[in-house]
């Protein structure tokens, strides 16, 4: 679900299709019909994440479980991150467009150590506090 504010900023970034979802084999479920919503995050760009076989296997497997909807989120490129921060748009899942902070679980697939800082950046962009007391 792309709202008007997001639609405006997509006109100002490179490769806007990486932020819209809607691709072939995307799994959409009825929010009211699921018990658990899981945000599967990959701390790199869409192109890198979608070429990761492990992520694709987990996405498919989790969505086969009854009552579970697994959605995807990727680290935005610098131009998109800048626009999202400027317009106060939190990091969102591709399938529903919902902010990551609205999910029951948020998980990350880490392929290498250099991605650790992107995890922190994605949590910050999603307005998810790093400490439970916040």
Segment roles from a protein language model:
Residues 1-134:
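A short, structured N-terminal alpha-helical element that caps or precedes a catalytic domain
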């Amino acid at each position: 679900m792309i709202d008007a504010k997001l639609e405006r900023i997509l006109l100002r970034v490179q490769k806007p299709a990486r932020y819209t979802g809607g691709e072939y084999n995307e799994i959409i479920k009825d929010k009211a019909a699921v018990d658990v919503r899981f945000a599967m995050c990959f701390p790199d760009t869409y192109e890198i994440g979608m070429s990761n076989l492990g992520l694709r296997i987990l996405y498919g497997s989790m969505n086969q479980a009854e009552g579970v909807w697994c959605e995807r989120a990727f680290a935005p490129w610098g131009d998109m991150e800048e626009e999202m921060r400027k317009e106060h748009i939190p990091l969102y899942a591709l399938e529903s467009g919902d902010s990551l902070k609205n999910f029951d679980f948020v998980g990350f697939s880490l392929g290498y150590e250099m991605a650790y800082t992107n995890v922190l950046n994605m949590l910050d962009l999603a307005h998810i506090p790093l400490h439970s007391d916040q």
